């Protein structure tokens, strides 16, 4: 049927012009020129067909796995999410930016409620040169439309992105928006504190910590963890281990049931650098904190055992000549029969 069609309907004008110009240099008969042009155009269409068929075949397995190509609030099953992941892997391996981006957008029609897809899309775009606005657009769509604020991880990454672009005020505003809805979200508060530390200095970070440790909207567990973070910044950023220790000591009565507080205090003392001559003093400090955990804190027995295991590890790895005696006595008190444990409590 194509043999009966005019050449102008078989190929684009620029293709016809190029072929005609080439063939007229080697063929003097117009009929020969047209016959050869038709042969080459047919070969061109056959090549396009084969390429298209090959591309379709590569993707057909993944396309068959797409059972729900539209948006719905109900969850996708794990099989479909896995299929989308493999499909994206395959398309990324091809290296075609436009095709890969188009597939991500198709995937989001179905899986817009899954922050892992938005994370993947943003990270892939960030790996492309000069795509900062596209990355920002992805984070904004995820944060403002699809992912509920009760799942703040994507918003925190959005804040990190804006900070990396020098928009510190926007990054701060994103954190504050999260905390308006989730006042005690520890990860967000820590992220905000470290943002201030990086951009405005240690004093600014401590001001944020002080604000939230005094905030009645924060739970005791969160405030205990923030005091531990405060001590960590004093030690790590100011090299003020004495100030950090005083902070722990002065606030201990407020956080008797805060596992992050006691765990951080114990690890703080264990991690203090000391030489052989100072190890005895360090041991006494570590032992004192451990005794507070066992006899003063109101932590659950299971948590006390976990923290005690850190102390026994310290005794084993850094303890002195009498460390094994103390370790075995402590092990019996913590893990021995009820008669021993009850005697210790009495």
For each feature predicted by the language model, list its residue ranges:
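Polyampholytic low-complexity alpha-helical segments
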Residues: 1-346
